[in-house]
Amino acid sequence: MSSPGIDGDPKPPCLPRNGLVKLPGQPNGLGAASITKGTPATKNRPCQPPPPPTLPPPSLAAPLSRAALAGGPCTPAGGPASALAPGHPAERPPLATDEKILNGLFWYFSACEKCVLAQVCKAWRRVLYQPKFWAGLTPVLHAKELYNVLPGGEKEFVNLQGFAARGFEGFCLVGVSDLDICEFIDNYALSKKGVKAMSLKRSTITDAGLEVMLEQMQGVVRLELSGCNDFTEAGLWSSLSARITSLSVSDCINVADDAIAAISQLLPNLAELSLQAYHVTDTALAYFTARQGHSTHTLRLLSCWEITNHGVVNVVHSLPNLTALSLSGCSKVTDDGVELVAENLRKLRSLDLSWCPRITDMALEYVACDLHRLEELVLDRCVRITDTGLSYLSTMSSLRSLYLRWCCQVQDFGLKHLLALGSLRLLSLAGCPLLTTTGLSGLVQLQELEELELTNCPGATPELFKYFSQHLPRCLVIE
């Protein structure tokens, strides 16, 4: 963070993506824009009493003063406020600082734009700093942005008061060390009770740092550790708290089977677990017990290359209440594993089988027969899926989202089966090389479709996109 913003806010560049928003450091971005106000001409009529004085309506006659923009009193174009006749009705606030108007107006701006607008004047900042405008956003702070360099070369921690005013419940810290985390806890007033979610990415946090963070920040219930290679499984044993309900661990080289043992024993209230670890085996999944079975509803096993159908057996028996399951990149899972999932996890609403090269059409038959509540199915890079598999899916009346990216055997005939999915809202066919313009044009029958992805499809021509714009006007077509 190169310099502090208003109230000492750090000002990194803006990066809105996947729910993460970096607070920007631009100067006042309004340029020469101004709000104007004028007074219409009036004539005295000798036989009529003069009309009562009224507030001048907005026009383009004269610019609003800088003081008015900053929240000061507004002076009409006809003269100073002191020249108004006695008994003149009280002035309304100028439109530029009318909080009722601003509260409605600011909803139309992105998070990055709000950061710039908050620097216009105190009145705008006061309105924009209400927590309602920042709900669901997570500030992303890099290690170098946490400090200001003083003239003597010393560093001081930035003022985070502006973050507290906006009521952020989560932070993402990138490239931080144990010391940086301790400084954050000491300098952010809400760190111990007000922060509910912490994400550490590409950081050098150790077992000791992880333990201190979770011990001091008693409000944290959602934790993400990504690319942190200095903590070990022993650190998880010593630091994890039963209050944690959501845990995500990815690209941390010291995470293996024993980490799952710690998670299963120390987190009885865990509702969501996302794990990307190349060294986790079927043995780890045997650690899950009935304790997690009642609370855990989401499990994502991403690129866990060593997990086989035996591991899937442990999952379906220990976690029967799952509503979302991802086996993305679990390349040893076969149709038999999918059959176990379909027969035992009847509450599933989301299933991700992407990058499972051993999955065939038979797996889709199991899914269609047993998972009647399924709303989302991800089959990206399942290269053995053919039109026959899509024919099984045509009976799934609840399916709303279907991803078939780079399913290289899907052809036009398979698309005809999808036309029976009247509830489908999102369809991705990116990278399917055998689909023709004729086959794709038939998708206009899916009138409820809201998003259609056709990137890298040879059959997706400019004429086809024009055809979709005419016949699927409410659908976002991604070229």
Swiss-Prot record:
A GO biological-process term: SCF-dependent proteasomal ubiquitin-dependent protein catabolic process
LRR repeat spans: 244-266, 267-290, 319-343, 345-369, 371-395, 396-420, 446-470
Function: Substrate-recognition component of the SCF (SKP1-CUL1-F-box protein)-type E3 ubiquitin ligase complex.
InterPro entries the record matches: F-box-like_dom_sf, F-box_LRR-repeat, Leu-rich_rpt, Leu-rich_rpt_Cys-con_subtyp, LRR_dom_sf
Coiled coil residues, start to end: none
Domain F-box: 94-139
Compositional bias (Pro residues): 47-60
Pfam families xrefs: LRR_6
GO CC annotations, alphabetized: cytosol; SCF ubiquitin ligase complex
Keywords for this protein: Leucine-rich repeat, Methylation, Repeat, Ubl conjugation pathway
Lineage: Eukaryota, Metazoa, Chordata, Craniata, Vertebrata
SMART domains attached to this UniProt entry: LRR_CC
Gene source species: Homo sapiens
UniProt protein name: F-box/LRR-repeat protein 16
PANTHER family documented for this protein: MITOCHONDRIAL ATP SYNTHASE COUPLING FACTOR B
Region listing for Disordered, in residue ranges: 1-62
List of residues that carry Omega-N-methylarginine: R92
Gene transcribed to yield this protein: FBXL16
Assembly mode: Interacts with SKP1 and CUL1.
